[in-house]
């Protein structure tokens, strides 16, 4: 079992890739069960992470996201799987010319592909809240993704890449 701060990177974001490529190959956007067409590729990448890790494979379950970031910052690791929000921390050590975000190779012609995005986390509104609080929450979420100040805060202050055409362009290289 992975430490909870790393769990999402390898079992969620990384696992999105074989599912994405299978959906693309089959021309679908939903299914009751995947066929597993690209699961060998997922296993190969996961195995590579274990065999070429900065520590013994038996120690990986205790490693945290902070450990992973620090190993990258200290030059112990060449690659660091994470998201655009890590730019703030990494830019304290590295210049933009020293950083890049690259797709994870999954054995398909993906030279024009973008980067993996986690869709497992959604914004939620508590239906048990007061109508006033529900409306305030909805207004705030709308402000975050439609207003200049909101999208600027999300892209610059929080480091998120916002997939809306009206959003501010992120200032980080990721």
Range-by-range predicted roles:
Residues 12, 87-93:
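Pocket-flanking alpha-helical
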Residues 30-61:
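Glycine-centered hinge/linker elements that transmit conformational signals in sensory
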Residues 54, 92-158:
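Extracytoplasmic/periplasmic substrate-recognition and gating elements
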Residues 65, 82-87, 119-121:
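Beta->alpha turn/N-cap motifs
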Residues 74-82, 97:
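Alpha-to-beta junction loops
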Residues 154-174:
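Long, aromatic- and glycine/proline-rich binding clefts that accommodate carbohydrate-like moieties
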Residues 59-74:
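Short helix-initiation/N-cap motifs at beta->coil->alpha
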Residues 1-31, 77:
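Extracytoplasmic/periplasmic solute-binding protein
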């Amino acid at each position: 079992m992975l430490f909870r701060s790393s769990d999402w990177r390898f079992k969620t974001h990384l696992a999105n890739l074989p599912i994405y490529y299978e959906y693309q190959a089959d021309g679908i956007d939903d299914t009751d069960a995947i066929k597993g067409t690209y699961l060998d590729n997922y296993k190969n990448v996961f195995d590579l992470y274990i065999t070429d890790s900065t520590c013994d494979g038996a120690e990986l379950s205790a490693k945290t996201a902070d450990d992973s970031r620090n190993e990258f910052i200290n030059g112990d690791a060449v690659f660091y799987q994470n998201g655009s929000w890590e730019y703030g921390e990494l830019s304290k050590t590295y210049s933009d010319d020293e950083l890049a975000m690259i797709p994870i190779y999954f054995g398909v012609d993906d030279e024009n592909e973008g980067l993996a995005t986690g869709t497992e986390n959604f914004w939620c509104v508590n239906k048990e809240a007061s109508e006033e609080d529900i409306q305030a929450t909805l207004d705030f979420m709308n402000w975050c993704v439609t207003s200049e100040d909101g999208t600027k805060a999300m892209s610059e202050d929080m480091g998120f890449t916002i997939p809306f055409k009206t959003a501010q362009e992120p200032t980080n290289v990721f």
